[in-house]
């Protein structure tokens, strides 16, 4: 019987962490959002050269072998609403941040920390989710 990881152990990796080559090991039970897979798939499809496309596809395939992406389900949708409202409360608009907010909502719904290279993308969410800059 496996134990469910505690909230303090769970961590979602933002796309910025996945694409970085110089990130130190991150502790915890790590996961990614299906949104990260979408962003990386987009990167494959818009690559300017066949070599870049092949390398991005190789990295995406490795990522998909290593992680089962967490889906955008009803719990994530509810979390998204809360996070988007928090962004509006800070005077910003959530529309330009939909992908980032969906990744953050995945972390929120799963009671996980969010690791990112771009903590400013998640400004205003600090009271709802633990944002860890790497």
Indicate where each model-derived feature is located:
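Short, glycine/acidic-enriched loop or turn micro-motifs at the edges of active sites
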Residues: 17
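Flexible glycine-rich beta->alpha loop in the catalytic core of nucleotide-sugar glycosyltransferases
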Residues: 120
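PIN-domain endoribonuclease scaffold, especially VapC-family toxins
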Residues: 2-11, 21-105, 113, 123-134
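Conserved catalytic-loop position in the HRD/HxD motif
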Residues: 14
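Conserved acidic donor-binding loop of glycosyltransferase catalytic domains
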Residues: 117
């Amino acid at each position: 019987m496996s134990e469910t990881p505690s909230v303090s152990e769970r961590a979602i990796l933002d796309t910025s962490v996945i694409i970085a080559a110089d990130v130190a090991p991150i502790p915890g039970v790590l996961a990614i959002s299906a949104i990260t897979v979408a962003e990386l798939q987009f990167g494959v499809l818009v690559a300017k050269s066949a070599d870049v496309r092949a390398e991005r596809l190789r990295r995406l395939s490795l990522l998909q072998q290593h992680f089962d992406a967490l889906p955008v389900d009803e719990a994530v949708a509810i979390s998204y609403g809360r996070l988007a409202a928090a962004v509006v409360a800070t005077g910003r608009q959530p529309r330009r941040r939909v992908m980032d907010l969906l990744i953050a909502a995945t972390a929120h719904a799963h009671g996980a920390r969010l690791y990112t290279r771009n903590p400013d993308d998640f400004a205003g969410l600090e009271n709802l989710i633990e944002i860890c800059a790497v």
